């Protein structure tokens, strides 16, 4: 949904030694979006399923939120980083993804 070169540019990574890790973070970020929002991502140009239900076509805001989350994970690769404040998800990612979130009542 975001090509590897775009993610690497966002992370300011030139080499290819971290490509597998970056791709794993990218896949995990979109999976996190789907779990957090209770929505199913559909690539642009891909037909919506019938019925559309909780499906959503990926937007620039969704991609930007994913890039921020990928950067967060890339910079802090361990579960706990000494000398920092623990956070669940970057606030900017929540702000970008929040409008798309479906909450089950």
PLM region spans:
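Divalent metal-cofactor coordination and adjacent catalytic microenvironments
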Residues: 1-105
């Amino acid at each position: 949904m975001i090509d590897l070169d775009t993610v690497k540019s966002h992370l300011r990574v030139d080499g290819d030694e971290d490509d597998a890790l970056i791709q794993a973070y990218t896949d995990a970020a979109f999976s996190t979006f789907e779990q957090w929002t209770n929505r199913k991502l559909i690539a642009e140009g891909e037909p919506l399923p019938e019925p559309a239900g909780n499906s959503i076509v990926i937007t620039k805001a969704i991609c930007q939120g994913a890039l921020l989350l990928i950067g967060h994970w890339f910079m802090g690769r361990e579960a706990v980083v000494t000398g920092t404040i623990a956070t669940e998800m970057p606030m900017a990612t929540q702000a970008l993804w929040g409008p798309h979130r479906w909450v089950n009542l």
